[in-house]
Amino acid sequence: MGQTVTTPLSLTLEHWGDVQRIASNQSVGVKKRRWVTFCSAEWPTFGVGWPQDGTFNLDIILQVKSKVFSPGPHGHPDQVPYIVTWEAIAYEPPPWVKPFVSPKLSLSPTAPILPSGPSTQPPPRSALYPAFTPSIKPRPSKPQVLSDDGGPLIDLLTEDPPPYGEQGPSSPDGDGDREEATSTSEIPAPSPMVSRLRGKRDPPAADSTTSRAFPLRLGGNGQLQYWPFSSSDLYNWKNNNPSFSEDPGKLTALIESVLTTHQPTWDDCQQLLGTLLTGEEKQRVLLEARKAVRGNDGRPTQLPNEVNSAFPLERPDWDYTTPEGRNHLVLYRQLLLAGLQNAGRSPTNLAKVKGITQGPNESPSAFLERLKEAYRRYTPYDPEDPGQETNVSMSFIWQSAPAIGRKLERLEDLKSKTLGDLVREAEKIFNKRETPEEREERIRRETEEKEERRRAGDEQREKERDRRRQREMSKLLATVVTGQRQDRQGGERRRPQLDKDQCAYCKEKGHWAKDCPKKPRGPRGPRPQTSLLTLDD
């Protein structure tokens, strides 16, 4: 008996019922044939590392999702339900997926593992986190301090100084024996401790695509170390995302993820805003962030001292190595995020919301996302608020495609339907719609049937006219013949009975008509002929 290889794609097909249930929980519907097509043929062409057999790697799934949700002609609205379902399976894996999902790496430092050998390929780069590649330029190794207890090693000579504040000593305490590494002209062989050093770290494992380089990161002795943003990541973030004025929601989501995962300092935040925003956009964001500062009573305040203390415009003297400094940075990042959200809201314009209509080939789920984004951008209302669900539902019905909107309006007990119920019904209608080829065939068939009915009607009317003309002519001929017959019969009845010796001309007795003295004598004229009406006349 041979063994079959289990892949993520085959695993989902074996548990297709669970996949459909997960998709239903996401208010979308999926079909097995399109599931296989997108996984094995479409997504591998996006160039983000998606294998033909599928994967449960969240980083790759998110990159495919960004391609699918791309605005304009580069997006793939028909693939939205399928990548959303993949993401849900990988984010909250069911029992049959958990054995195939690699455990999430912890952010805290762990004991390094001796690599099996140097990797010949560069480490994969994430679209979000900055990563550092090992240096290939030979240089003499620096003196390193080793600890007896096998703790992680920090290279003090290669660490950059922090942007502000004094950093405490990074060497472990204790008066144990110290060893000094020998200097050579070649790059030292990899070791467990060297893998901790910046610029000399080994490439991550093959199944890891997430960089662990954060601006603030715990060092070997439990103290935070500073890791600045790389220029390549800043460049990629700027070029692979729309401007703040064009799509504030997408850029705000990117900055929010950076603020959450990277824990940037005040200087890092200014660098991030200066790279991703224009000067006018940055000033608007900073102004809205300062408006969001709250006083001791929990209400917004305009006191300059409190505003400058929570959200300073000048470089503060916060020390991120102390709890107080970290608390200041956390509050600053929260206010900055609030400023981004408030500055991204356009003036209320319901006409813009009403102008969002469903495209001919756009799925209801993708249309709903565009509609919600319009609510966030052009109104002060939150479409996720339960109090706004009725307004969003009505907009979804009225602005859907005409065929979908008419059927949604005729649903029974429409008032009790939730927005999720409407989306599911719309998906059913959308999936049953006719293709362009079927529509052309239907129109051609209807045109032929209409032309055939027109020809049949013309022939029927022509036959009816011929029959009516025939009947009229027959009636006219019958009338003429009947009149002539009556004339002949009438003349015979008017002729009186004559005796044998009575004249037919003068009605006197004693002679006949040919010998009647009263009858004029002369040549007889031609007898008039009776003309009969024929069909040709």
From Swiss-Prot:
SUPFAM superfamilies: Retroviral matrix proteins, Retrovirus capsid protein, N-terminal core domain, Retrovirus zinc finger-like domains. The modification Phosphoserine is found at S191. RNA-binding phosphoprotein p12 is phosphorylated on serine residues. SMART domains: ZnF_C2HC. One of its GO terms (cellular component) is host multivesicular body. A motif (PTAP/PSAP motif) lies at residues 109-112. PROSITE patterns: ZF_CCHC. A zinc finger (CCHC-type) spans 501-518. It comes from the Viruses. A motif (PPXY motif) lies at residues 161-164. GO terms for biological process: viral budding via host ESCRT complex. The record marks Y129, P130, F214, P215, L477, A478 as: Cleavage. InterPro entries: G_retro_matrix, G_retro_matrix_sf, Gag_p12, Gag_P30, Retrov_capsid_N, Retroviral_Gag-Pol_poly, Retrovr_matrix, Znf_CCHC. Transmembrane segments: none annotated. Residues 112-217, 433-537 are annotated as: Disordered. A lipid is attached at G2 (N-myristoyl glycine). Residues 448-470 form a coiled coil. GO terms for molecular function: RNA binding; structural constituent of virion; zinc ion binding. Keywords: Capsid protein, Coiled coil, Host cell membrane, Host cytoplasm, Host endosome, Host membrane, Host-virus interaction, Lipoprotein, Membrane, Metal-binding, Myristate, Phosphoprotein, RNA-binding, Ubl conjugation, Viral budding, Viral budding via the host ESCRT complexes, Viral matrix protein, Viral nucleoprotein, Viral release from host cell, Virion, Zinc, Zinc-finger. Residues 344-392 are annotated as: Interaction with host PIAS4. A motif (LYPX(n)L motif) lies at residues 128-132. Residues 433-474, 485-518 have a biased composition (Basic and acidic residues). Residues 429-434 are annotated as: Interaction with host UBE2I. PANTHER family: GAG_P30 DOMAIN-CONTAINING PROTEIN. This is Gag polyprotein. The gene is gag.
